Amino acid sequence: MKKILIILTNTRYYGNSKDKTGLWLAEAAEFVYKVQEHGYQVDYASVNGGEVPLDPRSLKSTYRSKEIDEIYYSNDFQNRALKHSLKVSDLDPQDYFAIYYTGGHGVLWDFPNQPALSSITNSIFKQGGFIMSICHGLAGLVTIKDDQGNYLINNKKITGFTNFEEILSG
């Protein structure tokens, strides 16, 4: 059975500051909860592989639920997503029927202009797979070009995180 590839950030800080960022927990955990509920298998990957930091703000009770916590506290998520994510460049796109770009501000630094992400996303798309993102995860899709040099999102309807949502999230 082919799997869904979940792309996570390795970025721990906003640019060169000491302000912490990372993966927005709910944007991975809610998705994982739903797809696993329907019998799909997932792999977790990041540009560098290895550790994936969590945005501390995403751990507030306001952004948590029973389902999010079920995934977050699971050994599988702790080990395969947060401690030992796979390195994107080591993966075979033939193993996946979909790719999902998670959010959190960290992705703004390590998702755009990444050859390994572009390559695996294009391959999954060319084999008829699904390309998905949530929130800031869209940053990973806006720079990807197809084999003809056209942006992959050209002539597609897309959504992303609004400035108003930035204000609401603090």
What would you call each of these model-derived segments?
Residues 1-127, 140-170:
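Extended, subdomain-level signal for the structured scaffold at the beginning of enzyme domains
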Residues 131:
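Conserved, well-structured core segments that form or line functional sites
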Residues 134-136:
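Short, thiol/selenol-centered motifs that function as redox-active sites or metal-ligating centers
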